[in-house]
Swiss-Prot record:
Annotated Thioredoxin domain residues: 70-217
GO molecular function: thioredoxin peroxidase activity
Reactions the enzyme catalyzes: a hydroperoxide + [thioredoxin]-dithiol = an alcohol + [thioredoxin]-disulfide + H2O
Localization, UniProt: Plastid, Chloroplast thylakoid lumen
Active-site positions on this chain: C112 (cysteine sulfenic acid (-soh) intermediate)
Sequence similarity: Belongs to the peroxiredoxin family. BCP/PrxQ subfamily.
Function: Thiol-specific peroxidase that catalyzes the reduction of hydrogen peroxide and organic hydroperoxides to water and alcohols, respectively. Plays a role in cell protection against oxidative stress by detoxifying peroxides. Involved in both resistance against fungal disease and oxidative stress.
Annotated InterPro entries: AhpC/TSA (IPR000866), Peroxiredoxin_BCP/PrxQ (IPR050924), Thioredoxin-like_sf (IPR036249), Thioredoxin_domain (IPR013766)
Protein name (Swiss-Prot/TrEMBL): Peroxiredoxin Q, chloroplastic
Any one GO CC term of the record: chloroplast thylakoid membrane
Annotated transit peptide: 1-65
The organism of origin for this protein: Gentiana triflora (Clustered gentian)
Record gene name: AFP1
Tissue: Expressed in the leaves, roots and stems.
Note: The active site is a conserved redox-active cysteine residue, the peroxidatic cysteine (C(P)), which makes the nucleophilic attack on the peroxide substrate. The peroxide oxidizes the C(P)-SH to cysteine sulfenic acid (C(P)-SOH), which then reacts with another cysteine residue, the resolving cysteine (C(R)), to form a disulfide bridge. The disulfide is subsequently reduced by an appropriate electron donor to complete the catalytic cycle. In this atypical 2-Cys peroxiredoxin, C(R) is present in the same subunit to form an intramolecular disulfide.
């Protein structure tokens, strides 16, 4: 503990005794001290921070920017993106039938490959339910083409380079904003969202949940 030295005038010790009630060291008006980053009390510096002045966590603004904008019962933003063959594909082309739109992190990653192959294996069930499947990630069309060819994917993969559509739809990121989210939407024949399913670490459950919903609709 730091020692504080106070100058003492040359008086006899008894004269230093004061019979009056001592004043408190800190005034009752202490709350009027401005909440700045540094304040001085009795010559000592204290760091005082107001909660409103604290900087947000690094990923706070990023999380806000991807906070879910598309909700159940809403019509999501339209898009036109290139598919694995380099052709422009618009969401409006699928109006009149249910559409499963699933956003995934990246081609050729373990979880995304499992998810893609699970959609492939159940693709005929989706077709029987009258639905189309669309996968979207930030990979370019050539990556999608190789991915679809390698795993014999029969459905459309769209390239959202720059993740513009991901942001517009408000797909939430995972692991404190470091990992693109894995989220699936089911749109009805009118283009209205009827189901939103998010599960980063159980990619194959997206197929189970969406099929269950479509088959019960």
């Amino acid at each position: 503990m730091a020692a504080i030295c106070l100058p003492v005038a040359k008086h006899s010790f008894p004269s230093l005794l004061n019979t009056q009630t001592p004043k408190p060291l800190f005034s009752q008006n202490l709350h009027t001290i401005p909440l700045s980053s540094q304040s001085q009390i009795c010559g000592l510096k204290f760091l005082i921070s107001s909660p409103s002045s604290l900087p947000p966590p690094p990923s706070y603004s990023a999380r806000i920017s991807v906070f879910a904008k598309v909700s159940k019962g809403s019509v999501p933003p339209q898009f036109t993106l290139k598919d694995q063959d380099g052709k422009n594909v618009s969401l409006t082309e699928f109006k009149g039938k249910p559409v499963v739109v699933y956003f995934y992190p990246a081609d050729e990653t373990p979880g995304c490959t499992k998810q893609a192959c699970a959609f492939r294996d159940s693709y005929e069930k989706f077709k029987k339910a009258g639905a189309e499947v669309i996968g979207i990630s930030g990979d370019d069309p050539s990556s999608h083409k190789a991915f679809a060819k390698k795993y014999r994917l029969p459905y459309t993969l769209l390239s959202d380079e720059g993740n513009k559509i991901r942001r517009e739809w408000g797909v939430p990121a995972d692991l404190f904003g470091t990992l693109p989210g894995r989220q699936t939407y089911v749109l009805d024949k009118n283009g209205t969202v009827q189901l939103i399913y998010n599960n980063q670490f159980q990619p194959e459950k997206h197929i189970d949940e969406t099929l269950k919903f479509l088959q019960s609709a």
